[in-house]
Amino acid sequence: MELKLNRKYKDTLFRKVFNNKKDLLSLYNALNNTEHMDDSLITITTIEDAIYIGYKNDISFIINSELNLYEHQSSVNPNMPVRGLIYFAELYKGYIDQNNLLIYNERIVKMPFPRYVVFYNGTEEQPEEQELRLSDSFVQVPEGEGLKDTAGTEADKTNKPSVEVVVQLLNINYGCNQELMEKCQKLMEYSKFIALVRVKSDMLTEKYKKEMKSVNKKEIFAEAVALAIDEAIRDNVLKDILSKNMAEVTDMLLTEFDEKAYIDGVKKQSYEEGEAIGEDKLARLVVELKKRGRVEDIAKVTDEGERERLYREFNI
């Protein structure tokens, strides 16, 4: 099965909500416990004409000598620090070019301080806050093979990497991070609206199930979005955005729905392919062990660590 997704980038609702400096400043203040009032302090640096790893970063901006990268995600991706590395490299390159900084000069070049925040509102249970690190992706250097200092001793037994990216992952599902929500009205309203869409979707799914009607998930979701928009406008939730951009918001959410369905499909396909490969490897391992009369080791293959050790031993 070949899975396809239209890679033409469309704005997310999150980016739409925070596309003006006033609301973006409110979000920044809430995250950093600051009280800036002048939104002219913000310089938008979002890369508008490039898509990295199939996805464009949502919002990046400079304020107070800080380079902030904000991104919305409906699934937790452990490779977000890798994406962050690529984003920041491009953003800093642009900053150096724009400011005519001489990086080959003897004088140190001053750069804005990086901050990377990902706002998560998927359906999987996640803690309110967590950190993801680029160093978790690095292959660890075996003990004793670290850098040596001039005396020939190990300079750093922990083999600290030369590059690091830290992602602050915040759960913004309704009911999470209440203190943050209370400091940023727009974030609270965004969280409420997404929760409302899900409630309507669950309600319609149950309704059509009872009525024994055959309605596909996307049609149910589209109807749920329409109902949620009407109710949100009545309740003054994102009213300014929803009332003026109803069709655009609907299109954004349906696009996000398609992307989620695509990602879920890729995960399922990868899992099935992985299972098939795993079964083949295991069968080959058992054959090798039987050939060598190592019956006691066959019982050990149920342990993942032992299994991986045996794979390496037999180069499988």
Spans of features found by a protein language model:
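Elongated, amphipathic alpha-helical interaction scaffolds
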Residues: 1-316
